[in-house]
A protein has these predicted regions:
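Extended, charged alpha-helical coiled-coil/arm scaffolds that mediate oligomerization and mechanical coupling
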Residues: 90-156, 160
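A general boundary/transition motif marking the beginning of the first structured unit of a protein
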Residues: 11, 15, 25, 135, ...
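Noncatalytic partner-interaction/assembly domains of nucleic-acid and motor enzyme complexes
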Residues: 1-117
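Residues within well-formed alpha-helices
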Residues: 36, 57, 125, 146-149, ...
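Conserved small/polar residues in nucleotide/adenosyl-binding loops
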Residues: 174-180
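Amphipathic alpha-helical
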Residues: 157-173
Length: 184
């Protein structure tokens, strides 16, 4: 069978698996990179690959508990949630770290992951709008209002950053601070 005929009609969703891997690897080698990635992505929603979603979710659990994020702790958290094997095991996690020589570009990679996730959301939203327009059960004004709300919520997502409470973050920087009478 001709290769073109095999893939004809196959619509691949927008994705950047290399950027996803770079984000996850960067998060395991640098705590600041982990904070930056989480502030951009917020949740695992923007990841395309399910195993990457699970790894990111394990990292979020570790961050929320103020635990370090590295291959050992992520592996342990994935074991607890019974996802270690399904994500590829400890070898996959160490492979993610090995693929990233530095975490310096984590923000760029996280933005790419977020952008691809938003494109997938836009495709889903536009498909839902098309279905409503074809059904024509509602008035045109109602369909336009819903379409506008859906698109607006995607637009808000574009510029949103996730903010974290200062206390868990400040714990890792206590060695750099001066004691004062002000509470943390």
């Amino acid at each position: 069978m001709d290769e073109n005929k095999k893939t004809e009609g196959l619509n691949l969703q927008p994705q950047a698996l290399e950027a996803e891997e770079a984000v996850l690897g960067s998060m395991m080698i640098d705590e600041d990179a982990a904070n930056k990635a989480v502030s951009i992505l917020g949740s695992s929603h923007h990841f395309y690959k399910d195993s990457h979603k699970k790894i990111f979710e394990a990292m979020l659990v570790l961050m929320n508990n103020s635990d370090p994020i590295d291959t050992v702790s992520v592996s342990d958290e994935l074991k607890k949630s019974k996802h270690l094997k399904s994500v590829g095991g400890i070898y996959y996690l160490t492979g993610l770290v090995d693929k990233v020589p530095t975490s310096a570009r984590v923000e760029t990679y996280a933005e790419i992951v977020k952008e691809k996730g938003m494109l997938r959301d836009l495709i889903i939203t536009s498909h839902e709008i098309s279905k409503k327009a074809l059904d024509a059960g509602d008035s045109v004004g109602s369909i336009l209002d819903e379409a506008e709300q859906s698109i607006f919520s995607l637009t808000e997502q574009k510029d949103s950053k996730i903010y974290q409470h200062i206390e868990p973050i400040s714990v890792s920087y206590t060695h750099l601070t001066l004691p004062t009478s002000y509470p943390v």
